From Swiss-Prot:
Gene giving rise to this polypeptide: SYP24
Cellular component, GO annotation: membrane
Source organism of this protein record: Arabidopsis thaliana
Annotated keywords: Coiled coil, Protein transport, Transport
Described purpose of this protein according to its UniProt entry: Vesicle trafficking protein that functions in the secretory pathway.
Pfam families linked to this entry: LEA_2, SNARE, Syntaxin_2
Subunit structure: Part of the t-SNARE complex.
Annotated signal peptide: none
Region of interest (Disordered), ranges: 375-401
One Gene Ontology biological process: vesicle-mediated transport
Top-level taxonomy: Eukaryota, Viridiplantae, Streptophyta, Embryophyta, Tracheophyta
Extent of Basic and acidic residues compositional bias: 390-401
UniProt domain t-SNARE coiled-coil homology: residue ranges: 265-326
Name of the molecule in the record: Putative syntaxin-24
Coiled coil residues, start to end: 374-404
């Protein structure tokens, strides 16, 4: 009528928050189980008159919890929660002690759950006689993150995560301080080395976390087989164990993500610091190029001014020499003109005296002689005029030679 696969018992969630064996062999524990009972039949209902859950470790009883009575209808599911906590005396032998130490190292404990049940099956309006099956679940429960005796528990992960955040904040403050110009270069180098060392340590920690997750997920839950009609029915805990391991893995992945976020923030801060330094250096180089361009432009103007000053200086020196030469030439021309005028005056005075003397001579003088004398005088006067004309032309040529350099100098000075 009722087969073992018609009613399914499943531990879909388990949380072991405390599991510590003291030196006096007292085992302190705290375990919570979430159970689901599924009636897959559409024609029967089940009355549960007794339901008790008992936990065992190394075949030694830890504690038992009675569950409330209930009726499970057709194609229906009942969810139950059982809490086991307290302490009990546990005597472990040599091999069992070694297994406990192995469980303590890995953080995963092999715990058995026994369900003692009395139920009656109702078909239509008929109720059968009581049945007393026993259901056993073989569990491998990892010690919950955050437990007091967990070697790789959540408290340590949270502490490490907080240390990562604090270190990232300190590195961020150090990077902001390094932006100042008054900070020594040695301090900047030390802060950069510290950031690299922190990044390497964080990568090692993340690698260790991944290894821990792989070890925890490597445990394969026990898949029990049995008959519901026999005295003991072992129901596997494959799905619940997978869900539990997945939950623990997700929690650890969240911590890993937090650490990666902190690491990425530190990387971003370091990159921003490097970008700001590069921007500052680029701006300084641009300012240097601007100053250099202005200097080059001004240098061309200065060279033009120097060249013009040199040309003006040479032109002024040349003009000065021409002026001195013209002054000397003008002085000599004036003295020459004065001398010529004086000689002309003397000649004219001599001719006048001679004419007076000739006019006053004796009229009985020989006419032939007087004619010859007059001819001589005319010839002499003609020579004098020719000489005067030659001297006048020579003086004009010299004046032209003197006036040409003076005009060039004046034009150059006027242009400048």
């Amino acid at each position: 009528m009722v087969r073992s696969n018609d009613v399914k018992f499943q531990v879909y969630d388990a949380e072991l928050t405390h599991f510590d064996l003291e030196s006096n062999n007292n085992l302190q524990y705290s375990l919570s189980l979430n159970l689901s009972i599924r009636n897959s039949k559409s024609s029967i209902g089940i009355h549960y008159d007794r339901f008790e859950a008992t936990v065992y470790y190394m075949n030694q009883r830890l504690g038992a919890v009675p569950m409330p009575l209930f009726y499970l209808g057709s194609k229906n599911t009942m969810l139950l929660r059982a809490l086991f906590e307290g302490q009990t005396l546990v005597l472990l032998k040599g091999n069992e002690r070694k297994k406990f130490e192995d469980d303590q190292k890995t953080g995963v404990y092999r715990i058995d759950v026994k369900l003692s049940i009395n139920f009656r099956v109702m078909v239509l309006h008929l109720v059968t006689w009581p049945m007393k099956p026993v259901v056993r679940c073989h569990l491998k429960i990892p010690l919950a993150l955050g437990s007091s005796n967990s070697t790789g528990g959540h408290k340590k992960m949270l502490l490490i995560g907080q240390l990562v955040k604090d270190t990232s904040a300190n590195l961020r403050e150090a990077s902001e301080t390094d932006h100042r110009r008054d900070v020594a270069q040695s301090k900047k180098i030390a802060d950069a080395k510290l950031a690299k060392d922190f990044e390497a340590a964080l990568k090692e920690f993340q690698k260790a976390q991944h290894i821990t997750v792989e070890r925890e997920t490597s445990y394969i839950p026990f898949d029990p087989k049995g008959s519901f009609s026999s005295s003991e029915v072992d129901i596997g805990y494959d799905r619940s164990q997978e869900q539990r391991v997945l939950m623990e893995s997700r929690r650890q992945e969240i911590v890993l993500l937090d650490n990666e976020i902190s690491l990425n923030e530190a990387r971003i801060e370091a990159r921003e610091q490097g970008i700001q330094e590069v921007k500052h250096q680029i701006s300084e180089v641009m300012e240097m190029f601007k100053d250099l361009a202005v200097m080059v432009d001004h240098q061309g103007t200065i060279d033009d001014i120097d060249e013009k000053i040199d040309n003006l200086r040479s032109a002024a020196a040349q003009g000065k020499s021409h002026l001195v030469k013209a002054s000397n030439t003008q002085g000599s021309n004036s003295s020459l003109l004065f001398s010529c005028s004086l000689l002309l005056f003397f000649f004219l005075s001599g001719d006048l005296c001679r004419c007076v003397c000739v006019g006053s001579e004796n009229p009985r003088l020989n006419p032939t002689r007087r004619k010859a004398w007059c001819e001589e005088e005319d010839e002499e006067q003609r020579k004098k005029q020719q000489k005067k004309k030659t001297m006048s032309e020579k003086r004009r040529r010299e004046e032209k030679k003197v006036n040409k350099p003076n005009g060039f100098v004046f034009c150059v000075l006027g242009h400048k």
